């Protein structure tokens, strides 16, 4: 069962008729959980219906500004993330961007879900293993170096 009913999709995604259409991009996904709520947009865990792939869907709402001049918005932020994911698509250290679409003015970025530990869980689980922490830090330094070599 989807996390949202058709009526809830209409309300939460601020749409009128598009979400109720079977062709709407959001209907390609079974929403499982809201991971994070924010005024700039939410983050959802979902499953792509066509193949069962676990995905993360990031929503960006327009007109949410980050700077005093109003020149950098939440929409710019997530579009920049999509651009970077495309530039780094052949790298093993980034997740794959699988889809992007608009519903009315909201922009959605879809990427494969990567199972693993978040930073706090990693610190807790490796608290007695300095060797693992050092190897992980070395990997992070190598990744940042590789990204910088690409001019990013």
Question: For the regions a protein language model found, what residue spans apply to each?
Answer:
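Juxta-kinase regulatory segment immediately upstream of eukaryotic protein kinase catalytic domains
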Residues: 1-32
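Protein kinase catalytic-loop region centered on the HRD/HxD motif
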Residues: 142-152
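AlphaC helix of the protein kinase catalytic domain
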Residues: 119-128
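Structural motif at the C-terminus of the N-lobe alphaC helix and the adjacent alphaC-beta4 loop
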Residues: 83-92
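Conserved short submotifs of the Hanks-type protein kinase catalytic core
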Residues: 105-118
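Short beta-strand micro-motifs within the conserved protein kinase catalytic domain, predominantly
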Residues: 96-107
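ATP-binding glycine-rich loop module of kinase domains
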Residues: 40-79
